[in-house]
C-alpha cells in the first residue's frame, strides 16, 4: 500500500508463515502486533515480530546547531526515483577510494540493508529533524555521512517529511535524483517538478541549517 497500511489479504499469509516457525519483519506503518491473529500466532509459535518503522528511542527536537563532519543528502523530484540506490552507490564509490564514509538509512528498506537507521516517516513530526541529528552526529572533519532522502519537497503527501529530513541532515552537499520518463508524481495528480526547481527549493530551504549547502550532482533513474 502506498501509505504503508497492511493489506487485509496479507494477514492469513503472515499467520501461515508464523506457523512454519518464521520470524516476521514488516516495513509497514501498521504494526504487526496490532493484529490479534498475528500477535497470538507469534506467541503460540515463539517467533519474533519486527516492525522496522518503529523503535523505542526518545528523540529530541532539532536544534540546528553546526555539527562536525560532512554530510550529503539525496533528494528527489518524486518518491521512488532512486534516492536510496544513489546513496548506497555513492557510499560504495567513496569506500573504494578509502574515504571515511557511512550510509545513513532513513527508510525501512534502508534499515534492512544497513542493519541500523531510522524510518523517518514514522517519527512524530516535531522530532523529525532531531531524529536525523541523532542519526548523523558529530564526526571527524573528513568523514562523510551519506543520508538517504525520502519523498520530495514538491510532493503534496510527503513534503513535510522531506523538509524535516533536510533540516536535520544539515547537508553540505546534495544530489538530485530523477526519473526522466515520469510525467506525474506517484499517488497524486500533480506534475513532476523540474530538476532546476528542486535544486532551487532545496538550497532555499536547506540554508536554514547550513548556509553553504549546494548541489553536486544529478542521478538519473533510467530503469523505465
Model feature map: region roles:
Residues 3-4, 10-71:
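Extreme N-terminal, non-catalytic leader segments
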Residues 5-10, 80-88, 112, 153-158:
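Short glycine/serine/threonine-rich phosphate/pyrophosphate-binding segments
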Residues 12-18, 71, 103, 109, ...:
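Non-transmembrane, aqueous-exposed alpha-helical and coiled segments at domain scale
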Residues 23-29, 73-81, 118-122:
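Flexible, glycine/proline-enriched loop segments at strand-loop-helix junctions
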Residues 26, 30-32, 40, 49-59, ...:
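Conserved catalytic-core segment of NTP-binding enzymes
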Residues 37-38, 61-64, 85-87, 113-117, ...:
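Short acidic, glycine/serine/threonine-rich loops at helix termini
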Residues 59-97, 101:
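Walker A (P-loop) phosphate-binding motif
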Residues 71, 91-126:
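N-terminal phosphate/diphosphate-binding loop that engages ATP/GTP or pyrophosphate donors
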Amino acid at each position: 500500500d502506498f501509505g504503508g497500511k497492511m493489506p487485509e489479504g496479507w494477514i492469513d499469509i503472515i499467520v501461515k508463515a508464523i506457523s512454519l516457525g518464521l520470524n516476521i519483519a514488516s516495513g509497514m506503518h501498521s504494526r504487526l502486533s496490532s493484529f490479534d491473529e498475528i500477535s497470538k500466532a507469534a506467541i503460540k509459535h515463539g517467533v519474533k515480530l519486527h516492525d522496522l518503522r518503529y523503535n523505542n528511542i526518545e528523540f529530541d527536537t532539532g536544534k540546528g546547531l553546526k555539527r562536525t563532519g560532512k554530510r550529503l543528502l539525496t533528494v528527489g523530484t518524486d518518491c521512488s526515483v532512486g534516492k536510496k540506490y544513489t546513496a548506497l552507490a555513492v557510499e560504495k564509490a567513496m569506500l573504494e577510494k578509502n574515504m571515511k564514509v557511512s550510509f545513513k538509512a532513513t527508510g525501512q528498506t534502508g534499515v534492512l540493508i544497513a542493519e541500523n537507521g531510522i524510518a523517518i516517516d514514522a517519527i512524530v513530526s516535531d522530532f523529525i529533524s532531531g531524529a536525523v541529528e541523532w542519526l548523523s552526529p558529530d564526526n571527524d572533519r573528513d568523514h562523510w555521512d551519506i543520508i538517504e532522502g525520502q519523498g520530495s519537497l514538491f510532493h503534496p503527501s510527503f513534503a513535510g517529511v522531506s523538509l524535516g529530513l533536510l533540516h536535520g541532515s544539515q547537508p553540505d552537499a546534495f544530489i538530485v535524483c530523477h526519473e526522466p520518463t515520469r510525467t506525474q508524481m506517484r499517488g497524486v495528480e500533480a506534475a513532476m517538478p523540474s530538476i532546476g526547481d528542486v535544486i532551487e527549493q532545496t538550497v532555499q530551504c536547506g540554508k536554514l541549517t547550513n548556509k553553504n549547502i549546494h548541489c553536486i550532482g544529478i542521478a538519473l533513474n533510467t530503469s523505465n
